[in-house]
Amino acid sequence: MERSVTAGKWLAYCRLMRIDKPIGSLLLLWPTLWALWLAGGGAPAPWTLFVFVAGVFLMRAAGCVINDYADRHFDGHVKRTASRPLPSGEVSEQSAKVLFVVLVLLAFGLVLTLNTMTIWLSVAGLGLAWVYPFMKRVSHLPQFVLGAAFGWSIPMAYAAVSESLPATCWMMFLAYICWTVAYDTQYAMVDRDDDLKIGVKSTAILFGRFDNLIIGLLQFSMLALLLILGTMTGLGMPYYISLLVAGGMFIYQQILTAGRERDACFKAFHNNKYAGMAIFIGVLFGL
């Protein structure tokens, strides 16, 4: 019995860190890889690659923990999140705080093996990750903060590889923010009715009936910025083909979300992991 209880507790911690749902890690991983390859004009050093890949999974897990801690009094009132470990009581608030600190320390320990610029940037990134979960209390624009928090791996990657933050770095960062706001608005559309009842704010609520139009504009802006980025860095035809592929996926997502049904919006959100992968393949073969 004791062994089964222990196993159940570990499973609850895994669910709290979303180990069973890697979509968030993938949406963070792909642009990190774009930046690592573009910053150095090719494959980064193996250790640098390891630090960033491990850091993606550690910080995404930490972000999920602090997000659920911040939302612990709201999640129980939302159908999709009521069974999460904190609102269901499977994991205590104190345990969640300890887990968050452990994950952050592990990630920071890896960053300490990189250069000074990257270390300082990581401190700013932690601040963004901490602020994001609480933004939905005070603003309808938490998705923009999420984009900055998730996208902060881009300047960190440039700093780690080239010890510089050129214009191309910030162009990619801005493109990623546009993409994040687009896909996280799709995600927020799933919970929009529940969020309205409990007073949680989001871009899905702010955009209202113009949600799909604004998502489309954000997706177009992302592709336009990445197109300019490609010309600035001299990327080859495979990269531009990958942008067309991603654009096709965005059109598919628009078709999915046209009826604003929960399952369709969630499916559209998940489709973004393939768009990110397609662009990385384009970067890989376009260099």
UniProtKB/Swiss-Prot annotation:
It is an enzyme of class 2 (transferase). GO terms for cellular component: plasma membrane. Its cofactor is Mg(2+). One of its GO terms (molecular function) is 4-hydroxybenzoate polyprenyltransferase activity. Pathway: Cofactor biosynthesis; ubiquinone biosynthesis. Its EC number is 2.5.1.39. Keywords: Cell inner membrane, Cell membrane, Magnesium, Membrane, Transferase, Transmembrane, Transmembrane helix, Ubiquinone biosynthesis. It comes from the Bacteria. InterPro entries: HB_polyprenyltransferase-like, Prenyltransferase, UbiA_prenyltransferase, UbiA_prenylTrfase_CS, UbiA_sf. Gene3D superfamilies: UbiA prenyltransferase. It holds the Pfam family UbiA. It catalyses: all-trans-octaprenyl diphosphate + 4-hydroxybenzoate = 4-hydroxy-3-(all-trans-octaprenyl)benzoate + diphosphate. The keyword Cytoplasm does not apply. GO terms for biological process: ubiquinone biosynthetic process. It is a multi-pass membrane protein. It is found in: Cell inner membrane. The chain crosses the membrane at residues 23-40, 99-119, 141-161, 163-183, 213-233, 235-255, 266-286. The keyword Membrane applies. Catalyzes the prenylation of para-hydroxybenzoate (PHB) with an all-trans polyprenyl group. Mediates the second step in the final reaction sequence of ubiquinone-8 (UQ-8) biosynthesis, which is the condensation of the polyisoprenoid side chain with PHB, generating the first membrane-bound Q intermediate 3-octaprenyl-4-hydroxybenzoate. Belongs to the UbiA prenyltransferase family. This is 4-hydroxybenzoate octaprenyltransferase. It comes from Pectobacterium carotovorum subsp. carotovorum (strain PC1). The gene is ubiA.
